[in-house]
Design a protein with these regions (language model features):
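A short, surface-exposed loop/turn module that caps and links secondary-structure elements
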Residues: 42, 55, 60-71
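Hydrophobic ligand-binding cavity/cleft-lining segments
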Residues: 1-45
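Beta-strand/loop substructures that line and gate deep hydrophobic ligand-binding cavities in soluble
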Residues: 74-130
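C-terminal and inter-domain tail/linker signature
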Residues: 47-51, 64-65, 88-90, 99
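Short, hydrophobic/aromatic-rich segments at coil-to-beta transitions
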Residues: 47-55, 69-78
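Hydrophobic/aromatic beta-strand elements that line small-molecule binding cavities or substrate pockets
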Residues: 12, 63-69, 85-93
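Short, intrinsically disordered, mixed-charge
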Residues: 23-37, 72, 117, 121-128
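Glycine-centered tight beta-turn/hairpin loop motif at sheet-sheet or coil-to-beta transitions
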Residues: 5, 58-60, 82-84
Length: 130
């Protein structure tokens, strides 16, 4: 893999409880909304679980993902192709954190910042079930 080793951690406040955040990260029908303009391989499961694998595309950039760890408040992906490394999500009531370490020719922190901004906006529109 060509590129530079990069590591970035961002934690932001969000207007949502942990359960809503979890659903927005684990359910492809939700994360495909806020991760636009990325597209995804066909055949995604309804909910990601350990060993789920899929491909994301952003223009010509292709990244393979595999869920390697999943707890009630965290998820970790192994990444390869466009980024060789990992992406870890952690969340709780009112906050979400994204940590990425990997080798890429593109600036990982820029994409991470934009994605967290989109997630914040998406979560602000979600309603807490009664």
């Amino acid at each position: 893999m060509f590129g530079t080793f990069q590591q970035t951690i961002l934690r932001v406040e969000v207007d949502a409880p942990a359960a809503i955040i979890r659903d927005s990260l684990l359910q492809p029908r939700q994360f495909t909304q806020w991760l636009w303009p990325q597209t995804y391989s066909v055949g995604l499961p309804d909910v990601l679980e350990v060993d789920s694998t899929f491909t994301s595309y952003l223009g010509p950039l292709k990244v393979q993902h595999q869920v390697t760890d999943l707890t009630p408040q965290s998820m970790r992906f192994l990444l390869w192709e466009g980024v060789d490394g990992f992406h870890e999500w952690r969340w709780g009531d009112g906050w979400v954190q994204s940590r990425i370490e990997g080798i890429s020719v593109l600036p990982i922190n820029l994409g991470q910042s934009l994605n967290l901004m989109r997630l914040q906006r998406f979560l602000a529109t979600q309603k807490v079930p009664a």
